[in-house]
């Protein structure tokens, strides 16, 4: 596996790729969820490029940019074990200039839920991914369903900008107890890890209600809210795959999402119905 630390090194590597190229963009602190994305890419492409870049434009003032977990040696090891061809560590000064053109995410979907709590976040996501897609020129790019709102926004960007790549959604990876894997889980102490399970358990309750033919969104959200106590809940939402709110769950076309604070750490989770 090659370690690439500049745009010129990346472009040279990419020019020598003869077949399909899979791309896994990350912010590092890689875990088994990322490993699944990388393995999926390795199995479906001739070469796989992973990027690690803690993108400053998607963090708001006061968010955890400086505290965001970083583990370069661990990231390298995971990428090697998963069979990645190259690992790209961009430099922010190369990625961004002082006179940066703006890319604005679609207003409706980028200003609700995650976008309401983190205004401008998805603009930063679109900005960096547009640059990385142009640099890597991947055949396919891999994204986890855990960040489902981001996934839908990226799919929209690829379509609207006529980018020649396939976005491959990958299922959420969970611990054996149901906790969705997240780099931010490293912030949690043992007691908080127990409370964090309330997110996945609230979604399991929603799933069980749906299996019992309860499809009313308000009833499902109310039951989830009870399950989440005493956490500080940011939102509970039932939407279709275009992130339009729906009054009743539509089997095969719905996402149920939750965001809540466990201590000072904000966690998200969802299930696709």
Curated annotation (Swiss-Prot):
Pfam families named in the record: Pantoate_ligase
Positions with a binding annotation for (R)-pantoate: 58, 150
GO function term, MF aspect, one: pantoate-beta-alanine ligase activity
Protein name (record): Pantothenate synthetase
Annotated compartments: Cytoplasm
Residues at the catalytic site: 34
Species annotation: Campylobacter fetus subsp. fetus (strain 82-40)
The protein's assembly and partners: Homodimer.
Database matches in InterPro entries: Cyt_trans-like, Pantoate_ligase, Pantoate_ligase_C, Rossmann-like_a/b/a_fold
């Amino acid at each position: 596996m090659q370690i690439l630390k500049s745009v010129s090194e990346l472009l040279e590597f990419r020019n020598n790729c003869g077949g399909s190229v899979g791309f896994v963009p990350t912010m590092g602190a890689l875990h088994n969820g990322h490993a699944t994305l990388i393995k999926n890419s390795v199995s479906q492409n001739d070469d796989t490029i992973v990027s690690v870049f803690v993108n400053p434009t998607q963090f708001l003032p006061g968010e955890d940019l400086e505290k965001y977990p970083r583990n370069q040696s661990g990231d390298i090891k995971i990428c090697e074990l998963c069979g990645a061809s190259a690992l790209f560590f961009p430099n922010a000064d190369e990625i961004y200039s002082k006179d940066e053109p703006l890319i604005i995410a679609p207003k409706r979907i980028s200003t609700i839920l995650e976008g309401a709590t983190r205004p401008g976040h998805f603009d930063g996501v679109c900005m960096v991914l547009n640059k990385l897609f142009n640099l890597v020129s991947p055949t396919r790019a891999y994204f986890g369903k855990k960040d489902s709102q981001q996934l839908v926004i990226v799919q929209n960007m690829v379509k609207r900008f006529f980018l020649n790549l396939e976005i491959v959604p990958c299922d959420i990876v969970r611990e054996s107890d149901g906790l969705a894997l997240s780099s931010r889980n490293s912030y949690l102490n043992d007691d908080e890890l127990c409370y964090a399970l309330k997110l996945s358990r609230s979604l399991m309750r929603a799933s069980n209600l749906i299996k019992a033919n309860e499809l009313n969104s308000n009833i499902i959200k109310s039951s989830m809210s009870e399950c989440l106590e005493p956490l500080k809940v940011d939102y509970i939402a039932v939407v279709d795959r275009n992130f339009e709110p729906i009054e009743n769950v539509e089997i095969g076309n719905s996402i149920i999402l939750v965001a809540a604070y466990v201590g000072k750490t904000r966690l998200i989770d969802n299930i696709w119905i």
